[in-house]
Amino acid sequence: DSSTSRGLGDVYKRQVGGNAGQPETAAARKIMGQAKASRAYAYYYLAQLFQNSYDPAQPILPYYDGELTETAKVPASQIYALVVSDLTEAVELLDGYARPDKSKIDKTVAQGLLAYVHAGMGNFAEAKVMADAVIASGYPVTTAGELAYPGAGSGFNNVDTPSWVWGFDLSEELGHELIDGWGGMDVFE
């Protein structure tokens, strides 16, 4: 019933039990995996905004564990531990999920995000393991030719470029949905 739903958070709590939930069905595992990957990505994005380079001891963000009480900033190490934990769980939960298109988060997206986070923390060996897993799953490294080609078929202009793991095919049908939401979520764009 959409009249009582409060979005993904409500579905996450009702269908999979929130943070403590143990999803039993494939649908519940998908929801939990995508929710954890989304939360990890949001926290990582915020961490990048409030810290120029990874300093585990620097207090950067408040950490909310489900209680809606005001909380103080916690050290980056605590935020990054949550991010790594969420993405690691997302990789496990999304194993076997076949997404309908590149706009959905699947195991490979979670692995790519985890590689990104490990690289940001200076954990280059772990970043390589995750990046290699993404490449091994069928996403090759973008070639110089794909990047240099001007126009509609180049590496950054087409979601169908083989190396793109996660993205949206921008079209008029999307309206303002992407522009107003996740479309501007990467600090490096």
Question: Where are the regions a protein language model picked out?
Answer:
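Short coil/turn linking the two alpha-helices of tandem helical-hairpin repeats
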Residues: 47-55, 98-99, 120-123
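Conserved, well-structured interaction surfaces
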Residues: 1-49, 78, 92-97
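Hydrophobic-face positions in mid-chain alpha helices that act as interaction patches
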Residues: 68, 128-189
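Alpha-helical junction/boundary sensor with strong preference for TPR arrays
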Residues: 16, 50, 87, 94, ...
